[in-house]
Amino acid sequence: AEGDQRASFIPFARWDENDDERTHLDLREAYWAHEGLSYKGMDIELLIGINKVFWGVTESVHLVDIINQTDLVEDLDQEDKLGQPMVNLAVQKDWGLLNVYILPYFRERTFPGVDGRFRAPLPVNWDDAEYESGDKDKHVDFALRYSHYFGDVDVGLYYFRGTNREPRLEVAPNGRELTPFYDQVDQVGLDLQYTKDAWLWKLEAIVRDGYDESFMASVAGFEYTFYQVYESDADIGFLMEYQYDERSSREPA
């Protein structure tokens, strides 16, 4: 067949003697991809399986990163992600890169158990998660992303429709635990990065419609790097970012 084929298999395992919820197995990647295909001057790649996809440019929070679910039992910084089943079609041409994602299965967020640290005052019982969609974790999500560069500016713009990766946490009827509730959302996201010498100027912004409301959130800032400080191999970077979320403090967690 035309083009090149590749496969990836990256398992992950964690055992915790104190917290049973933190003991888990996962496939971070397990996919087959066919790249180098060509159609009417366009370069095409098809990927089928489980993969991790990262979107974003800022450091303090990744607002636009929505494909993969957070593996919260690994770390509070939400950098660790669960593998996401997907079909990904990528089309590259001189006008930019277009990615289409079909996400046929939803991964629930992991939470520490009763004996886990760190956790909320009430433990989260994610075994009893609830969904807005009647399809629950079988709901098929969809995402479309365009990315390109214009001079020194890198741009990413996407639309996502499906199950929100961030659950609302509701107090269970017994009053002793929290239950995750996953809404259906429509989300538009934008990420920009302007590179000039040692400066990086960054912006991430989203508009999300779901849970009977629409809201906008953004994070913007800069990063400056001093290279080879005192003629050494060390670099020093300075970072400043500002976060904004127009939701009120009374919104449910």
Locate the predicted segments by residue.
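Residues on the lipid-exposed face of transmembrane beta-strands in outer-membrane beta-barrel proteins
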Residues: A1, E29-H34, V87-V91, L144-H148, ...
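Residues that define the transmembrane beta-barrel architecture of outer-membrane proteins
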Residues: A1, T23-R28, K81-P85, Q92, ...
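Outer membrane beta-barrel
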Residues: E2-F118, G151, L239-E241
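Outer-membrane beta-barrel strand-turn architecture
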Residues: E2-G3, G36-K40, Q92-W95, Y149-D152, ...
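Extracellular loop and loop/strand-boundary signature of outer-membrane beta-barrel proteins
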Residues: F12-D20, D71-D75, D128-E132, N174-L178, ...
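Outer-membrane beta-barrel proteins
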Residues: N18-E21, D43, W55-S60, R107-G113, ...
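Surface-exposed beta-loop-beta
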Residues: R117-S214
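Detector for outer-membrane/organellar transmembrane beta-barrel domains
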Residues: A198-A253
